Amino acid sequence: MPELPEVETIRRAVGPQVRGKRIIHTNVRATKLRHPLPPELDRLLVGQLIVAMDRRGKYLLLRCKGGTIIFHLGMTGMLYLVKASSPHGKHDHLDLVLDGSYILRFTDPRRFGTIIWTDNDPLQHPLLVAHGPEPLEAEFSASYLYLKRHRRKIPIKQLIMDSRVVAGIGNIYANESLFRAGIAPQTSASDLSPDKDLLLVDAIKGVLTDAVEAGTSNIESALTGERPQGYFPYEFSIYGKKGRPCPKCGSAIRMMRLGGRSTFFCPLCQK
């Protein structure tokens, strides 16, 4: 599932290329996504001038002169540029044909993605208004985390995946951040010691920064006009590595289900 680093990489790759372009046509091939596409989408979008592409948590905001298209990539979604002559595939559900030689294409094999148009402030949309701070911004600090977690008797992993607490952290990077911080994912949020607040905040910022930088170094692949083969290769320390040796101590990485999600941890390094 694309999380904050993958979404930020798309923003950095695609945003500068579409800024200043006008939507001259749309091709809608499937309307039944997580939220059904409005039948008047073509009328709303044709003629719109794109002014910026922003990100909020895991959402992409394609800001136009008259409103904003809100994208969520779901489990398998991708937003990328293709050449105007590029044939569409089975799972390419929306094309925004731009003036010039490119199409902004949304593909989503499992159809859990979201495409919504709003002519109001997108940050006040029901999908976004309750989001907590961005994890890479100064507002997300050790003192902030303490205020949000010290009375919560839920596993710390579930807390940091709550977008109302902090925006954009999904299962993959929650696993990676807790491993870097040396904190067991099942630890009750209320039981975390104050010194661990700083460790965890620093770990989250570090893991996400490393992943974004890995994506930025591979950003050219999003601009070739060819169908992408997947997201950038970021070398995970622990996610998806059940039974393999811990990169810190060599003991076997374990997996459990926590909040219905696969959770990977080292029983020796994470306490």
From Swiss-Prot:
Gene3D superfamilies: 1.10.8.50, MutM-like, N-terminal. Pfam families: Fapy_DNA_glyco (PF01149), H2TH (PF06831), zf-FPG_IleRS (PF06827). GO terms for molecular function: 8-oxo-7,8-dihydroguanine DNA N-glycosylase activity; class I DNA-(apurinic or apyrimidinic site) endonuclease activity; damaged DNA binding; zinc ion binding. InterPro entries: DNA_glyclase/AP_lyase_DNA-bd (IPR015886), DNA_glyclase_Znf_dom_DNA_BS (IPR015887), Formamido-pyr_DNA_Glyclase (IPR020629), FPG_cat (IPR012319), MutM-like_N-ter (IPR035937), Ribosomal_uS13-like_H2TH (IPR010979), Znf_DNA_glyclase/AP_lyase (IPR000214), Znf_FPG/IleRS (IPR010663). It comes from the Bacteria. DNA binds at H91, R110, R152. Signal peptide: none annotated. Keywords: DNA damage, DNA repair, DNA-binding, Glycosidase, Hydrolase, Lyase, Metal-binding, Multifunctional enzyme, Zinc, Zinc-finger. Binds 1 zinc ion per subunit. It catalyses: Hydrolysis of DNA containing ring-opened 7-methylguanine residues, releasing 2,6-diamino-4-hydroxy-5-(N-methyl)formamidopyrimidine; 2'-deoxyribonucleotide-(2'-deoxyribose 5'-phosphate)-2'-deoxyribonucleotide-DNA = a 3'-end 2'-deoxyribonucleotide-(2,3-dehydro-2,3-deoxyribose 5'-phosphate)-DNA + a 5'-end 5'-phospho-2'-deoxyribonucleoside-DNA + H(+). Its EC number is 3.2.2.23, 4.2.99.18. The keyword DNA damage applies. The active site is at P2, E3, K58, R261. A zinc finger (FPG-type) spans 237-271. PROSITE patterns: FPG_CAT (PS51068), ZF_FPG_1 (PS01242), ZF_FPG_2 (PS51066). Its cofactor is Zn(2+). One of its GO terms (biological process) is base-excision repair. Monomer. HAMAP family: Fapy_DNA_glycosyl (MF_00103). Belongs to the FPG family. Involved in base excision repair of DNA damaged by oxidation or by mutagenic agents. Acts as a DNA glycosylase that recognizes and removes damaged bases. Has a preference for oxidized purines, such as 7,8-dihydro-8-oxoguanine (8-oxoG). Has AP (apurinic/apyrimidinic) lyase activity and introduces nicks in the DNA strand. Cleaves the DNA backbone by beta-delta elimination to generate a single-strand break at the site of the removed base with both 3'- and 5'-phosphates. This is Formamidopyrimidine-DNA glycosylase. It comes from Geotalea daltonii (strain DSM 22248 / JCM 15807 / FRC-32).
